[in-house]
Curated annotation (Swiss-Prot):
GO terms for cellular component: cytosol. This is UPF0246 protein HAPS_0280. Belongs to the UPF0246 family. InterPro entries: YaaA (IPR005583). It comes from the Bacteria. NCBIfam families: PRK02101.1-1, PRK02101.1-3. One of its GO terms (biological process) is response to hydroperoxide. It comes from Glaesserella parasuis serovar 5 (strain SH0165). Signal peptide: none annotated.
Length: 257
């Protein structure tokens, strides 16, 4: 069983991580092509392209300039520990055991606008390049055109290494859009997390993102081998709703917080 998640805009490159054998990202030749395009932009152009502040734009212009194909422990950090958004708050990578991290290396992948697809212990350098960015490139008008079937091919290889051909989609629509799902030989299931608000259950973004991270944590700690076992997820007070679920969507609900 393989899970996929989105990356995060918030990064932590201050905290050092030791005790692991880090891996190299596999698609840096493609990353370099994107960096070469991004290096041509002024801070004002980056601010406009990414809809970010001038301060953030300047930071990312500097990041593009400093990015290098060589990834080592001095200039990079393992992706699982570098990302710090809501999903990763729910995942709590720092409190996982080494055995759980080792399992994650085989059963978890992170989608990325710059790196395409990352394993948890892949070294990455600080960047900001969301998958939805309309970055014109030789292959087309945006990153979906750029990555085309590359991410899908590498994802299939990771799925083929599993014993059950199950892909658990915990990524956002923006990032899963870079996967050509119809080309995958896999049973794809998407957990959906609904929180009660004023008596009605609905997706509340902050809670849903955190729940995706909690589901990854659940998978790393219980090592499920069937969709049935995924339904036992109960972290954070969520429970599986059989009636609201389908073959491809697993619905989990939680009472108002």
């Amino acid at each position: 069983m393989l899970a996929i998640i989105s990356p995060a805009k918030t990064l932590d490159f201050e905290t050092k991580i030791d005790g692991f054998v880090f891996s190299q990202p596999e698609l840096t030749a493609y990353s370099q092509q994107l960096i070469d395009i991004c290096k041509q932009f002024s801070p004002a152009e980056v601010a406009s392209l990414m809809s970010i502040s001038d301060k953030l734009a300047s930071l990312n212009v500097a990041r593009f300039a400093e990015w290098t194909m060589e990834h080592n422990e001095q200039n990079a950090k393992a992706a699982l520990f570098a990302f710090k958004g809501d999903v990763y708050t729910g995942l709590e990578a720092e409190t996982l055991t080494n055995a759980e991290i080792d399992y994650a290396q085989r059963h978890l992948r992170m989608l990325s606008g710059l790196y395409g697809l990352l394993k948890p212990l892949d070294l990455m350098q600080p960047y900001r390049l969301e998958m939805g960015t309309k970055l014109a490139n030789p292959k087309g008008k945006d990153l979906y055109h750029f990555w085309d079937n590359i991410i899908t091919q590498h994802l299939q290889q990771a799925i083929d290494a599993q014993e059950d051909n199950i892909l658990v989609n915990l990524a956002s629509d923006e990032y899963f859009g870079a996967v050509q799902a119809e080309r995958l030989t896999a049973k794809i299931v998407k957990p959906v997390f609904l929180d009660e608000k004023n008596g009605k259950y609905k997706v509340i973004s902050f809670y849903a993102k955190k729940a995706r991270g909690m589901m990854v944590r659940f998978m790393l700690q219980t090592q499920p081998t069937s969709i049935e076992q995924l339904k036992a997820f109960n972290y954070g007070g969520y429970w599986f709703d059989e009636t609201a679920s389908t073959d491809t969507e697993l619905v989990f609900k939680r009472e108002e917080q």
